[in-house]
């Protein structure tokens, strides 16, 4: 299986085989400390369960990934297609010191031991790795970001900043709401058609007066359009809305819920 479900000390997370050369992971809601309704591994800053519980949740998740949570850099998501190039000067922003940026839904870096963190609770997350140029990226790609082309723009940003070639990139698309549960009105399919044209059609279907949309499939389509090889892309295939016992889901829980995190980092040279 391209994605692996892992468990350690009650904490459950997913990894992708395509990224097995570097530290990375997609968290679930299992293995943290807060009480309901934030139980238990909520990684959402400034939401619900207090700073001490949040710090402990970060410590636990980053420990199983073999990473230092004090050096991670958090996105500041507003469903845009904005991308931030991260350097050591950003280390810890969002965790141990305030973020001095807003409207950032994707992060890229070519510096080691500088974990990039993006969030979701049904939206898509995409982790990227360039094993040739040694660079990584992380993108939050909900339907608005997908329609705005954030995945392709993140690939382009890595190409512009680090000389990455799309054919070299490896990508993992984490758990997100599936076609089974992502029921929408016509505005979402219309936005996808405007962005992807006929390539969007296989990932959407009409059921009565509503539409069902395959968000992961659409984000994968953007990766293919950007030039990634199909064999370099892995999709979890897990629907967050189908598994509210395992994942935070905005569709199932509304605003009273936490978030998952998707994290990626380059190894530190010893």
Across the structure, where does each feature detected by a protein language model lie?
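Active-site microenvironment for binding and transforming phosphate-containing groups
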Residues: 1-270
């Amino acid at each position: 299986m391209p994605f692996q479900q892992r468990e350690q000390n009650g904490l459950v997370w997913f990894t992708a085989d395509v990224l097995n050369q570097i530290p990375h992971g997609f968290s679930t809601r299992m293995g943290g400390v807060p009480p309901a309704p934030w139980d238990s591994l909520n990684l959402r800053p400034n939401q619900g369960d207090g700073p001490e519980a949040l710090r402990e949740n970060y410590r636990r998740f980053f420990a199983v990934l073999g990473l230092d949570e004090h050096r991670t850099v958090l996105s500041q998501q507003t469903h845009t297609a904005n991308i931030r190039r991260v350097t050591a000067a950003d280390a810890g922003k969002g965790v141990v010191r305030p973020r001095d940026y807003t409207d950032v839904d994707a992060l890229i870096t070519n510096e080691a031991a500088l974990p990039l963190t993006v969030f979701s609770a049904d939206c898509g997350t995409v982790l990227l790795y360039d094993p040739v140029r040694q660079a990584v990226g992380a993108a939050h790609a909900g339907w608005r970001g997908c329609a705005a082309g954030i995945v392709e723009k993140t690939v382009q940003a890595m190409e512009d900043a680090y000389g990455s070639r799309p054919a070299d990139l490896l990508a993992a698309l984490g758990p997100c709401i599936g076609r089974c549960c992502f029921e929408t009105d016509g505005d979402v399919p219309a936005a996808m058609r405007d962005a992807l044209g006929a390539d969007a059609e296989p990932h959407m279907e009409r059921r009565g007066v509503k539409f069902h949309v395959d968000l992961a499939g659409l984000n994968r389509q953007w990766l293919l359009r950007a030039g990634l090889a199909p064999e370099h892309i892995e999709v979890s295939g897990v629907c967050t809305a189908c598994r509210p016992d395992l994942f935070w889901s905005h569709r199932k829980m509304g605003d009273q819920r936490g978030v998952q995190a998707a994290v990626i980092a380059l190894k530190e040279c010893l």
